[in-house]
Amino acid sequence: MTRLLGYVDPLDPSFVAAVITITFNPLYWNVVARWEHKTRKLSRAFGSPYLACYSLSVTILLLNFLRSHCFTQAMLSQPRMESLDTPAAYSLGLALLGLGVVLVLSSFFALGFAGTFLGDYFGILKEARVTVFPFNILDNPMYWGSTANYLGWAIMHASPTGLLLTVLVALTYIVALLYEEPFTAEIYRQKASGSHKRS
């Protein structure tokens, strides 16, 4: 880690922008989704929980594009690491990127659009929590797929800055999950409890 830090200028504007977007994005969608779950104000404003969810998803996607752009610019503005600048490392990065894409896309198809973009906070619930691939091989595959994408991208660019930012991506997801997992579990517990009472 100390060796990586020697390549990184933490005051570089591109690096600062990447750090801000990486940490802001999960905070944004968690705060907005919980506020919606508590107040239903977005659903009322848009006249439908589906429209509200889709509108939030647009902002999340735009923020994710911005995060990826800032991540890439931060890598390009700082030195490459010679020991990573090899065909073998590039191939490893490409494989990680491919794995990440598979996890992200398969998660999206398993969850559906609303499920991917916090639909459960809008009252758009599935019959039960999703357990098909890739959820049957690991928890939170969307987040780990995204992390693999960034890790692969960083290795392909032989970028110590990218590796450090990937660690930050993983840490922000871990912190987000500390809030999201119990909350989602409680939403589905309440749904199951309500179903039992009606039956």
UniProtKB/Swiss-Prot annotation:
Tissue distribution of the protein: Primarily expressed in liver (at protein level).
Intramembrane bits: 13-33
InterPro entries, alphabetized: PEMT/MFAP, Phopholipid_MeTrfase
Catalytic activity reported: 1,2-di-(9Z-octadecenoyl)-sn-glycero-3-phosphoethanolamine + S-adenosyl-L-methionine = 1,2-di-(9Z-octadecenoyl)-sn-glycero-3-phospho-N-methylethanolamine + S-adenosyl-L-homocysteine + H(+); 1,2-di-(9Z-octadecenoyl)-sn-glycero-3-phospho-N-methylethanolamine + S-adenosyl-L-methionine = 1,2-di-(9Z-octadecenoyl)-sn-glycero-3-phospho-N,N-dimethylethanolamine + S-adenosyl-L-homocysteine + H(+); 1,2-di-(9Z-octadecenoyl)-sn-glycero-3-phospho-N,N-dimethylethanolamine + S-adenosyl-L-methionine = 1,2-di-(9Z-octadecenoyl)-sn-glycero-3-phosphocholine + S-adenosyl-L-homocysteine + H(+); 1,2-di-(9Z,12Z-octadecadienoyl)-sn-glycero-3-phosphoethanolamine + S-adenosyl-L-methionine = 1,2-di-(9Z,12Z-octadecadienoyl)-sn-glycero-3-phospho-N-methylethanolamine + S-adenosyl-L-homocysteine + H(+)
Origin: domain of life: Eukaryota
Pathway the protein acts in: Phospholipid metabolism; phosphatidylcholine biosynthesis
Coiled-coil region: none
TM spans (from-to): 46-66, 94-114, 158-178
Entry's localization field: Endoplasmic reticulum
Spans within the Cytoplasmic topological domain: 67-93, 179-199
Gene Ontology CC entries for this record: cytosol; endoplasmic reticulum; endoplasmic reticulum membrane; intracellular membrane-bounded organelle; mitochondrial membrane; mitochondrion
Family: Belongs to the class VI-like SAM-binding methyltransferase superfamily. PEMT/PEM2 methyltransferase family.
Name used for this protein in its record: Phosphatidylethanolamine N-methyltransferase
Gene: PEMT
